[in-house]
C-alpha cells in the first residue's frame, strides 16, 4: 500500500479534511467532494493502521460513529467508500508499494 501519510499528525489532519468534505458533500450534494472526502478519510485511516485490514475496519467504525443516526448519510458514505476503494486499488496496482505488493 502506498503510504499516503507517514506522519500520524498529518494523517489525522487528512482524516479531518476528509470528514469536512464528506459533511459538505452531504449538505450540498456535491459528488466531487464526496469522492475526494472519502478518499482522504479512507487513505488516512489506512495509513494510520499501517495499510493493514484494520484500516478498513476502523474506517467503517469511525464512519458509523460520525453519522450514527443518519442512515441516508451512511448509505452515501458506503457508496463513496466503494468508489474510493476501487480508485485506491487501481492506484496501488499502477504504483505498487515499497514492498512490491500487498501485505496484511
UniProtKB/Swiss-Prot annotation:
The keyword Cell membrane applies. One of its GO terms (cellular component) is plasma membrane. It is a multi-pass membrane protein. Keywords: Cell membrane, Membrane, Transmembrane, Transmembrane helix. It is found in: Cell membrane. The chain crosses the membrane at residues 53-73, 74-94. This is Uncharacterized protein MJ1219. It comes from Methanocaldococcus jannaschii (strain ATCC 43067 / DSM 2661 / JAL-1 / JCM 10045 / NBRC 100440) (Methanococcus jannaschii).
